[in-house]
Amino acid sequence: MQKSLATFFISPPEIPTQHGPDNILYDFNDGARVLLPEGKWHVRLLDADSGNILFCCDINNGWVTSSKKYFVRFRIQVFRQGEDSPLLDETLNLTDRDVLISFPTGTLGDLLGWFPYAERFQSLHQCRLECTMAQDIIDLLAPQYPQICFSTPEKPRTTEPYATYRVGLYFGGDTNNQPVDFRQVGFHRSAGYILGVDPREAPVRLNLSAPCTIREPYVCIATQSTCQAKYWNNGTGWSEVVAHLKSLGYRVLCIDREAHYGQGFVWNHIPWGAEDFTGSFPLQERVNLLRHASFFIGLASGLSWLAWATGIPVVLISGFSLPDSEFYTPWRVFNSHGCNGCWDDTSLNFDHKDFLWCPRHKNTDRQFECTRLITGTQVNGVISRLHASLMKQGDKACLTKGTNNEQGL
């Protein structure tokens, strides 16, 4: 069963959308762009904040574009050759302008991690912002952000934006689409750097108004992911965790989309003893279920981000990414005694087509040891401390409605 990895960005308009004097066209839809008619021109692209000249040239006609595509407060100057005063002098100003932020589609965790930076961007610049993303995520977020226009990449509403920014994961040491490699700052925080806003993380806003429909205390788990490196590859880990949760009095609900997932000869299955709540449900239904869970246990994947946004504690198990690669949770489970952190290694490039990607130890007995060495005992120890923290509050509601994720150990 192959998951869809459909993902694409909105391309810039074929010609710049802004009209300057003497038929000069310009915009900021792929960095700074200038299209010049026949003439003798001198063009400068500057960083307006530092005053540094980033590029200058003499040109008779054609295009001048910046190499940097992320947010820079560009200043475009176009002179007639030999003249001291610019004919066009435009400094990027997004206030009351049509701006597009293009996100990839099909990546729940990425979008939930990135989107708060788009809201921060709109609030800072007071622009007319449109964001493109997958429809199921639009359905989840749009009611909470009325000041932002949402659309799918196939049907953008803004056809002539003043500026466009493309938030995504850029590999291979790319510093034209991102000012700092996402693997050095955490993939979600890279959106803050691309958009030029405060990179501190924040959860998305969600509709948390649904009532609790399950009387017993319960914990939600999600065990599936998009590649084997993201799984918890300890053979008995999940079985030990489910048994421990039941001994503490919790129902254990598995809320993955698929009960079984894999490729080729490697398949992963719903843990024995967990209740099967799997299926392709609207994201809001998952929110309704998570909101009243005592806590959530999962991987470095989208449902962990969704659980975090509902405000419940998240036990996050990961080894292929470093502890600061995702949102902060005091209940992070990481084992430093083996190979780890390949996702965040800037000398490596993740291979999306290799389901068994393990760049340092593939086809050896050390393959996936980053999570294989995370034992059920280690995870159950974190669960026991979290459970004790909930019990210590002396509020029975904490067991059924959860508690804020920022509580310490």
UniProtKB/Swiss-Prot annotation:
It comes from the Bacteria. Coiled coil: none annotated. InterPro entries: Aah/TibC-like (IPR030929), Glyco_trans_9 (IPR002201), TibC/BAHTCr-like_N (IPR049327). One of its GO terms (molecular function) is glycosyltransferase activity. Its EC number is 2.4.99.-. Keywords: Cytoplasm, Glycosyltransferase, Iron, Metal-binding, Plasmid, Transferase. GO terms for cellular component: cytoplasm. It catalyses: ADP-D-glycero-beta-D-manno-heptose + L-seryl-[protein] = O-(D-glycero-alpha-D-manno-heptosyl)-L-seryl-[protein] + ADP + H(+); ADP-L-glycero-beta-D-manno-heptose + L-seryl-[protein] = O-(L-glycero-alpha-D-manno-heptosyl)-L-seryl-[protein] + ADP + H(+). ADP-D-glycero-beta-D-manno-heptose binds at T107, L108, G109, Q224, T226, K230, R257, G302, E326. SUPFAM superfamilies: UDP-Glycosyltransferase/glycogen phosphorylase (SSF53756). Transmembrane segments: none annotated. Disruption phenotype: Severely reduces bacterial colonization of the gastrointestinal tract of orally infected C57BL/6 mice. Binds 1 Fe(3+) cation per subunit. The active site is at D110. Its cofactor is Fe(3+). It holds the Pfam family TibC_1st. Glycosylates autotransporter CARC. By glycosylating CARC, involved in the colonization of the mouse host gastrointestinal tract. Homododecamer composed of 6 homodimers forming a ring. This is Autotransproter heptosyltransferase BAHTCr.
